[in-house]
Regions:
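Catalytic centers of hydrolytic enzymes
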Residues: 42-45, 54-57, 73-76, 183-203, ...
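Extracellular fibronectin type III
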Residues: 18-35
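Surface-exposed, short loops/turns at beta-strand junctions within beta-sandwich domains
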Residues: 2-8
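Short coil/turn segments at beta-strand junctions that form active-site/ligand-binding loops
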Residues: 7, 79-81, 225, 379, ...
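Acidic, metal/ion-coordinating pockets
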Residues: 36-316, 360-372, 434, 451-453, ...
Length: 556
C-alpha cells in the first residue's frame, strides 16, 4: 500500500459564549512529514461514533441504517479500516431501544460492524446482569482499562477486556478504554455490584494512572503498531478559547497515538502533545473519519487528519437494507402504543447547548414536572435532577407515524405530545418517591445540585421553593438563600419537610447522598405520573403550560 499523503490538519476548538452555545475559534495544526520513503508506511482509517444512545431512527441524525451504509462505503477506500465507539451506545435512549431492553441498538451496532467500544456511564443504567446480556449479543469487543475487575462482565462466551488488538491489512491497532470515574454517581446505586464465587463485589471505576498505563504497556507488548484510547470523558469549559476538561487532561498525559472522547456531546478536534484528539456530538448526528499514517517498523504515527462527517457530506444517502428492516421490525412492535396522543403543550422545551440548559439553570419542563409530582403527592417540595431530562419536549428524536401532528418549534403551537415523547424525555424508568428531610439536608441537596455548574447533570429543578445560587463561590458555599412560596426562609436546621424526588436521587445518584433512604416511600413510575397529568389537562380541554417563573436565580 502506498504511503498516506496528508494535508496539514486544521482542527477546531470550541469556545462557549454566555448563552452556552459553541462556535469555531482558533485552530492548531499538525503537519505530516513531507516525505518518508524508506519506512513501511501504512494508511489506517478509523470511523468513530460516541453517545449514540440508541438513536436508531434518522430523526435529525443518520439513524442506524444510514450509518451502516456509510461505514460500509468508507471501508471500501481502505483495507485497514476500524470502526469504534467511545461509549453510551445504550441507555437514555428512545423507546425503540429502551422499551426493548436496548437489544435493538446492539443488533444495529453489529450491523454497522463495530470493532471495539468502551463502556460509558449509561451502559450501567441497568444492572450488570443486563449489561452481560448486551455483551453476550455483541459481535464486537468491549474494553475497560480503568475498572478494578471485569469478572462481573464475563458472560462465559464474550467478556470485556482491559485492552484489545485488531489487525487488518498488516496493521495491528491496539485499543484501551476509559470510562468516566463519575459513573457511580450517575447511575442507580447497586448497578456495579456482582457476585463471584459466592462473594459480593462491586466494580470500582477510577482515573488511576497505574491501571490505565498498565493497559497501555500491555497492548504495546501485544504488538500494537499504534494505540487508540477510547475515552468516555469530554470537555466542559474553556479558558481563553481553549477547551479544558478530563478528555484534554488524558490527551496530554497518555502515551498513545490517538484519543477519542465522548460524554459531553460536543464536537471537538485538536492536537495535544502531538496527539490527535477528537470527539463528535451525540445521537448519531455525525461521526469522525480519521486517517493515520503509521510506520509499522517503528510503531510510529507520522501524521493524522480528521474530518467530521454529517449527513450533508457523507458518502452515501442510501440506508442499509438489513439494518433498516431490523429497526422497522422493532418500531412496528411499539408504534401504535407509543403514538397515542396524551396532550398538548404551549412550547417546545429545549435541551443541550455547550452548557446544557437543563443542567445549568431553571428549565420549563423541569419546573412543570416538579410541580406535577409535588401536587400529586402533596409534599412541601419537589426536586428533579436535570440529568434526567433527555430530550426536547415534544421529542425531536421520536417521530410519530401521524405527520399531521404539530411537533416542530418552527410551527405554530400548541404542540402535540404522544406517549413516545414522554418515554423519550424520561427513558430511565425511575420511580417518584417521597421522603422526609430536614432543612439542613435540603440545603445540602441544593449545594450538591449546583456544585458542578456548569457541568454534570445534577442541577436541581424544584417546586414549592425558590433558591439563589452564586456559582462564583466555592463548592459547598454556593446556595445564598432558600425560601418557600410565601417568601419565608428555609433555615439550615432540623425542622422537617416532605420532599418528592426520584428513587435515583434519593439513593445517592448524581451525588445526592444526604438523604435517609430508610425513610423513603416509593410511589409511581416517573413517566406514568407525567402521562397522567398531561391526559388530565387534555380531558379538561387545556393546553399544558410550561414556563420559567424565576424560581431559580443564578449569580455568575
Amino acid at each position: 500500500m502506498p504511503a498516506l499523503s496528508l494535508d496539514p490538519m486544521t482542527v477546531t476548538v470550541q469556545a462557549v459564549n454566555e448563552y452556552g452555545i459553541s462556535a469555531p475559534v482558533a485552530t492548531e495544526t499538525l503537519v505530516t512529514p513531507a516525505s518518508v520513503t524508506s519506512a513501511p508506511l501504512k494508511s489506517v482509517q478509523l470511523l468513530q461514533l460516541s453517545d449514540f444512545h440508541g438513536q436508531l431512527e434518522p430523526n435529525r441524525s443518520f439513524g442506524a441504517a444510514l450509518l451502516a451504509s456509510n461505514f460500509a462505503v468508507e471501508r471500501l477506500s481502505n483495507d485497514a479500516a476500524f470502526t469504534v465507539s467511545s461509549g453510551d451506545n445504550i441507555g437514555a435512549a428512545p423507546p425503540i431501544s429502551s422499551q426493548n431492553a436496548e437489544l435493538p441498538t446492539i443488533k444495529a451496532m453489529n450491523g454497522m460492524k463495530f470493532d471495539v467500544s468502551v463502556f460509558g456511564n449509561h451502559e450501567h443504567d441497568r444492572n450488570l446482569a443486563h449489561l452481560r446480556q448486551m455483551i453476550r449479543y455483541s459481535e464486537f469487543q468491549w474494553v475497560a482499562s480503568n475498572y478494578n475487575s471485569l469478572r462481573g462482565l464475563d458472560t462465559g462466551t464474550n467478556r470485556a477486556k482491559t485492552f484489545t488488538t485488531v489487525e487488518r491489512d498488516g496493521v495491528k491497532v491496539g485499543f484501551i478504554g476509559i470510562n468516566t470515574k463519575d459513573t457511580p454517581e450517575q447511575i442507580t446505586p447497586g448497578n456495579l455490584d456482582f457476585n463471584y464465587a459466592g462473594k459480593a463485589y462491586s466494580i470500582n471505576i477510577s482515573d488511576s494512572e497505574t491501571r490505565i498505563n498498565r493497559a497501555i504497556r500491555d497492548v504495546k507488548a501485544a504488538g500494537a503498531d499504534m494505540v487508540v484510547a477510547l475515552i468516555h470523558e469530554g470537555w466542559n469549559a474553556n479558558t481563553g478559547g481553549e477547551a479544558v476538561g478530563p478528555l484534554i487532561d488524558y490527551a496530554k498525559s497518555l502515551d498513545v497515538d490517538l484519543v477519542y472522547g465522548a460524554h459531553s456531546h460536543q464536537t471537538y478536534s485538536s492536537v495535544h502533545e502531538g496527539t490527535l484528539t477528537a470527539m463528535v456530538s451525540n445521537a448519531g448526528a455525525e461521526y469522525n473519519r480519521t486517517q493515520v499514517c503509521v510506520n509499522t517498523a517503528t510503531n510510529t504515527v507520522l501524521g493524522a487528519s480528521n474530518e467530521v462527517i454529517t449527513t450533508s457530506n457523507a458518502p452515501s444517502n442510501t440506508a442499509d437494507a438489513d439494518v433498516a428492516t431490523m429497526v422497522n421490525d422493532y418500531k412496528s412492535k411499539n408504534q401504535a402504543k407509543l403514538d397515542v396522543k396524551v396532550g398538548q403543550v404551549n412550547i417546545v422545551t429545549p435541551i443541550g447547548g455547550t452548557t446544557p440548559v437543563q443542567r445549568s439553570g431553571e428549565h420549563a419542563f423541569g419546573n412543570w414536572s416538579a410541580d406535577v409530582v409535588r401536587a400529586k403527592y402533596g409534599t412541601d417540595f419537589a426536586l428533579v435532577n436535570g440529568g434526567g431530562i433527555r430530550s426536547t419536549f415534544p421529542a425531536s428524536t421520536y417521530e410519530p407515524a401521524d405527520k399531521t401532528l404539530v411537533r416542530d418549534e418552527t410551527e405554530t403551537g400548541p404542540y402535540d405530545i404522544v406517549l413516545g415523547d414522554v418515554y423519550t424525555i424520561h427513558p430511565f424508568g425511575s420511580v417518584f418517591s417521597v421522603i422526609e428531610v430536614t432543612g439542613t439536608q435540603l440545603w445540602a441537596a441544593l449545594e450538591n445540585g449546583v456544585s458542578e455548574y456548569p457541568n454534570n447533570g445534577r442541577w436541581p429543578h424544584v417546586s414549592g421553593m425558590k433558591f439563589t445560587a452564586d456559582v462564583t463561590k466555592a463548592k459547598g458555599s454556593r446556595i445564598v438563600s432558600i425560601t418557600d412560596l410565601s417568601g419565608a426562609a428555609i433555615a439550615k436546621d432540623s425542622k422537617t419537610y416532605t420532599l418528592t424526588l426520584t428513587d435515583f436521587v434519593a439513593k445517592g445518584g448524581d451525588g445526592y447522598n444526604m438523604f435517609d433512604v430508610a425513610k423513603l416511600q416509593v410511589r409511581d413510575l416517573d413517566a406514568e405520573v407525567l402521562i397522567e397529568a398531561l391526559r388530565a389537562d387534555m380531558a379538561a380541554g387545556k393546553v399544558t403550560e410550561m414556563k420559567l417563573d424565576g424560581r431559580t436565580t443564578v449569580i455568575k
